[in-house]
């Protein structure tokens, strides 16, 4: 069983090399750099913002017309869509780095992916294609289990569903879009999760944002992790419930704030809360941290709350058979009231699911805006998911699924260990395939991405507003399809680019 010992979280699980029956997981896997780093980063961003604001004023007053202040003359009299800070940041900082975001791919996003080459000659306002393409090692796609292929049993199953059912179901679940394929994949997912029932939706973001309002209302209380995904935040806002934010992955802080809130009344109704919903994620997509699930289950049981677990990045990616953080920690899935996950990442399809008791899932079927008004998941996407889940559960008669899970775990541990040995500051837990490398400076993360592309390696550069203004980072997404040769080549390139950009903010760790 998972649990806590001496303030450290402990879980059960096995790895291929020297089984680890007790994995000690740091509860604060986000180490801080030297004290002066944030001061220097603050100075850097302040100077850039002051320069941007001065340029904006000069342009507005007609003193100097900058090339960066390009706009549509037909919209000069329009009110701006965003606030002045966002506009200044976008025009003078973000736009200069648009070459490292929204990169167009022209092939299957596997371990190797093709990118369309492009350049800008107007400070990022437009990108022009060169007519050539580059093959790069792919560290940007969420292809955790390596199911993103254009051939093989999953692709064949998807093609067979097109032949049999076509592309579109033609309506919502409550109208004529309730397809037999939906019931089949929902049954498969429920069995995989070891819950009573499940329901699928055609979009992962909407699985959260459109369904949370069906679970709580303005008389309810939501306890939400500070770093929860935007889809969860949107769902909380749409629900109208009073939302209290607790410190990241801190069940004790969650309990304190829950207890304080229960001593009062809902500020929206003036009455006692009618229900409480705690919302957490399995793996946090920008930090790479694995949730301390046993501690949150303990809080849920103590206060009779509903527990909502978003496994967008953890389903398929952790656990001996990829069943997510409940399996990883050795917890009973039925202690989690709503198990949400996306089908776009580990299973290389599209959409999302919710799993739980039949009573909860039937409630969602009846009251969710997604089932009432949204069109349904496409048959070939369903086939891709169903085949991938069967492989991961071992019901295809092979050991492929388990080997994928083992390989992903080995890749995650090896890559993280080697980055730390080189002196990089890396966020997240050792078993997480989401690997953030901290650069802190937005200027450094942009240059880091550009230089990695010269080594034919595609990475994700992340900055504000996806992260705090002073905490820009590179994010590597590992896959079971990455070979050791891939990882060693990447590590050599990362070390070289790290020296060129000055991004060694960690302490060299020789042995972990």
UniProtKB/Swiss-Prot annotation:
It holds the Pfam family Aminotran_1_2. One of its GO terms (biological process) is ceramide biosynthetic process. The keyword Chloroplast does not apply. GO terms for molecular function: pyridoxal phosphate binding; serine C-palmitoyltransferase activity. Its cofactor is pyridoxal 5'-phosphate. It catalyses: L-serine + hexadecanoyl-CoA + H(+) = 3-oxosphinganine + CO2 + CoA. CDD domains: KBL_like. One of its GO terms (cellular component) is membrane. InterPro entries: Aminotrans_II_pyridoxalP_BS, Aminotransferase_I/II_large, AON_synthase_class-II, PyrdxlP-dep_Trfase, PyrdxlP-dep_Trfase_major, PyrdxlP-dep_Trfase_small. The modification N6-(pyridoxal phosphate)lysine is found at residue 345. Gene3D superfamilies: Aspartate Aminotransferase, domain 1, Type I PLP-dependent aspartate aminotransferase-like (Major domain). Its EC number is 2.3.1.50. Signal peptide: none annotated. The keyword Nuclease does not apply. Pathway: Lipid metabolism; sphingolipid metabolism. Keywords: Acyltransferase, Lipid metabolism, Pyridoxal phosphate, Sphingolipid metabolism, Transferase. Component of the serine palmitoyltransferase (SPT) that catalyzes the first committed step in sphingolipid biosynthesis, which is the condensation of an acyl-CoA species and L-serine. The catalytic core is composed of a heterodimer of sptl-1 and sptl-2 or sptl-1 and sptl-3. Required for the specification of abicobasal polarity and development of the gut lumen. Heterodimer of sptl-1/sptl-3. PANTHER family: CLASS II AMINOTRANSFERASE/8-AMINO-7-OXONONANOATE SYNTHASE (PTHR13693), SERINE PALMITOYLTRANSFERASE 3 (PTHR13693:SF54). Belongs to the class-II pyridoxal-phosphate-dependent aminotransferase family. This is Serine palmitoyltransferase 3. It comes from Caenorhabditis elegans.
């Amino acid at each position: 069983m998972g649990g806590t010992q001496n303030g450290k979280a402990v879980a059960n699980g096995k790895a291929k090399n020297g089984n680890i029956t007790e994995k000690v997981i740091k509860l604060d896997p986000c180490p801080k750099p030297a004290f002066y780093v944030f001061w220097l980063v603050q100075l850097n961003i302040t100077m850039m913002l002051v320069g941007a604001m001065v340029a904006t004023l000069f342009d507005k007053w007609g003193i100097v017309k900058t090339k960066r202040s390009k706009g549509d003359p037909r919209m000069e009299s329009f009110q701006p869509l965003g606030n002045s800070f966002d506009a200044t940041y976008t025009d003078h900082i973000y736009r200069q780095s648009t070459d490292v975001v929204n990169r167009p791919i022209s092939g299957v996003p596997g371990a190797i992916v093709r990118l369309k080459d492009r350049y800008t000659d107007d400070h990022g306002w437009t990108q022009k294609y060169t007519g050539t393409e580059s093959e790069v090692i792919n560290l940007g796609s969420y292809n955790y289990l390596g199911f993103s292929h254009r051939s093989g049993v999953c692709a064949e199953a998807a093609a067979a569903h097109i032949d049999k059912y076509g592309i579109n179901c033609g309506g919502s679940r409550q109208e004529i879009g309730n397809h037999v394929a939906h019931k089949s994949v929902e049954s498969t997912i429920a069995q995989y999760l070891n819950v009573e029932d499940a329901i699928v939706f055609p979009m992962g973001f909407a699985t959260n944002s459109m369904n949370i309002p069906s679970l709580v209302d303005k008389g309810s209380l939501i306890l939400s992790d500070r770093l929860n995904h935007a889809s969860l935040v949107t769902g909380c806002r749409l629900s109208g419930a009073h939302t209290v934010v607790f410190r990241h992955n801190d069940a004790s802080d969650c309990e304190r704030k829950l207890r304080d809130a229960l001593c009062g009344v809902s500020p929206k109704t003036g009455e006692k809360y009618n229900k409480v919903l705690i919302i957490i994620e399995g793996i946090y997509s920008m930090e790479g941290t694995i949730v301390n699930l046993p501690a949150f289950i303990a809080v849920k049981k103590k206060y009779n709350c509903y527990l909502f677990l978003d496994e967008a990045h953890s389903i398929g990616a952790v656990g001996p058979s990829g069943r997510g953080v409940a399996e990883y920690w050795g917890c009973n899935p039925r202690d989690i009231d709503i198990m949400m996950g996306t089908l776009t990442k580990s299973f290389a399809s599209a959409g999302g699911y919710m799993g739980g008791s039949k009573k909860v899932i039937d409630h969602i079927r009846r009251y969710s805006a997604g089932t009432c008004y949204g069109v349904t998941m496409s048959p070939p996407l369903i086939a891709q998911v169903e085949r991938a889940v069967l492989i991961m559960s071992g019901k295809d008669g092979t050991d492929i699924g388990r080997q994928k899970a083992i390989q992903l775990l080995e890749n995650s541990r090896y890559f993280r260990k080697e980055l730390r040995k080189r002196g990089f500051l890396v966020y997240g837990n050792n078993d997480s395939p989401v690997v953030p490398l901290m650069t802190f400076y937005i200027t450094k993360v942009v240059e880091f991405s550009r230089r990695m592309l010269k080594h034919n390696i595609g990475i994700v550069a992340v900055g504000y507003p996806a992260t705090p203004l002073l905490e820009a980072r590179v994010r590597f997404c590992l896959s079971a399809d990455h070979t050791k040769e891939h990882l060693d080549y990447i590590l050599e390139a990362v070390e070289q680019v790290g020296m060129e950009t000055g991004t060694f903010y960690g302490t060299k760790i020789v042995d972990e």
